[in-house]
């Protein structure tokens, strides 16, 4: 057999392989992307859209596995995990670090790495890390938030309207008109809701002047 005949047979085999791969790729039906779920879902190919039964009113579409089931029809057991009677009692596997906060696992890892170092170096590094963590935690202390959600939570706790500062414990209907007919008491109330009691007592100019006067009276040596 001539060399050019061998090359021709090899080229023919490669063409057959390419055609076969192309037909396989064309036969693949692209499915929509589904996000990962916490529990296993029903197998693919059994959804109401693949069976063409999504338009029938007797079928109810499941929100978790997107599978159709009939209300008035007996079926053999739950078709999805969330349809089990004890689904509300199912729990995820326990986290081994659930009793620790977000910083303690990092601290434990740092201790395991610093074990071969001398004792004084270990104490210095851990003290610096703890000081930094304490400063970060103190930067966003509790009850000092100034966001809209924090204002709403504070107003709900103090039973005031977060828009206009109207007291809600009077059980009287009111029209929220923020910025209009704002008296000194309402402005102080709104400042208290927006800044919080701690920041309002420490940073409000009126309270700051009073605190300065008391400090001057207490620290005056006369």
Swiss-Prot record:
Compositional bias annotation for Polar residues: 1-12
Pfam families: Viral_NABP
Region (Disordered): 1-21
Taxonomy, superkingdom: Viruses
Job of this protein: May act as a regulatory factor during viral transcription.
Protein name: 23kDa protein
């Amino acid at each position: 057999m001539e060399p050019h005949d061998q090359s021709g047979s090899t080229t023919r085999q490669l063409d057959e392989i390419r055609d076969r791969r192309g037909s396989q790729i064309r036969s693949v039906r692209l499915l929509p992307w589904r996000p990962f779920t916490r529990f296993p879902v029903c197998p693919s190919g059994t959804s109401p859209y693949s069976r063409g039964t999504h338009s029938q009113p007797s079928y109810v579409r499941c929100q978790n596995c997107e599978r159709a089931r009939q209300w008035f029809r007996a079926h053999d057991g739950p078709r999805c995990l969330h349809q089990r009677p004890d689904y509300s009692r199912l729990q995820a596997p326990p986290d081994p670090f659930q009793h620790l906060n977000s910083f303690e696992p990092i601290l434990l890892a740092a201790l395991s790495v610093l074990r071969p170092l001398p004792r004084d170096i270990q104490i210095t590094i851990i003290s610096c890390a703890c000081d930094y963590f304490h400063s970060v935690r103190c930067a966003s202390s509790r009850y000092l938030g100034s966001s809209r959600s924090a204002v709403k939570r504070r107003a709900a706790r103090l039973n005031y309207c977060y828009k206009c500062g109207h007291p809600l414990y009077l059980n009287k209907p009111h029209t929220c008109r923020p910025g209009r007919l704002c008296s000194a008491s309402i402005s102080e109330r709104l400042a208290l809701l927006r800044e919080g009691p701690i920041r309002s007592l420490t940073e409000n100019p009126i309270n700051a002047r009073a605190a300065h006067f008391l400090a001057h009276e207490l620290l005056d040596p006369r």
